[in-house]
Amino acid sequence: MVEWTDSERAIINDIFATLDYEEIGRKSLTRCLIVYPWTQRYFGAFGNLYNAATIMANPLIAAHGTKILHGLDRALKNMDDIKNTYAELSLLHSDKLHVDPDNFRLLADCLTVVIAAKMGAAFTVDTQVAWQKFLSVVVSALGRQYH
């Protein structure tokens, strides 16, 4: 079990309190699909992903990005039991969707870049430490079924 300080909890909650889920979700997922094009293979049913412009304009990608952010909201609300909170989602991604678990880390990195850009100077070292810890726990929980 991960131990969270009051400061870490406050930082994570503050980040989520200011997030525009639609904007940040869309930007994070599109960034991941563009920067790491091999991740596109999991989104074949989402239509044309031919180039960066079509990915950025794809409403299904935008909607899925929003869904991902709402999924992170579940982790926020269950910070003391993220592993069990994501057990079913981990099973889905491993057994049914066959997602390479390294892609969770890539998406987390893209999400960090987008949030840091949005927050600017407010994304301090302490903020990044707490945020990276949170995402590391989420990524580990999502990859649980692969171990």
UniProtKB/Swiss-Prot annotation:
Binding of heme b, residues: H64, H93
One MF annotation (Gene Ontology) recorded for this entry: metal ion binding
Domain (Globin): residue spans on this chain: 3-147
Annotated InterPro entries: Globin, Globin-like_sf, Globin/Proto, Hemoglobin_b, Hemoglobin_oxygen_transport
Pfam family, one: Globin
CDD domains in alphabetical order: Hb-beta-like (cd08925)
Tissue-specific expression: Red blood cells.
GO terms for biological process, alphabetical: hydrogen peroxide catabolic process
GO cellular component: blood microparticle; haptoglobin-hemoglobin complex; hemoglobin complex
UniProtKB keywords: Heme, Iron, Metal-binding, Oxygen transport, Transport
The protein's assembly and partners: Hb 3 is a heterotetramer of two alpha-2 and two beta-2 chains.
Purpose of the protein: Involved in oxygen transport from gills to the various peripheral tissues.
Note in the entry: Hb 3 displays a Bohr effect, which is enhanced by organophosphates, and a Root effect.
Family: Belongs to the globin family.
Protein name: Hemoglobin subunit beta-2
Protein's organism: Arctogadus glacialis
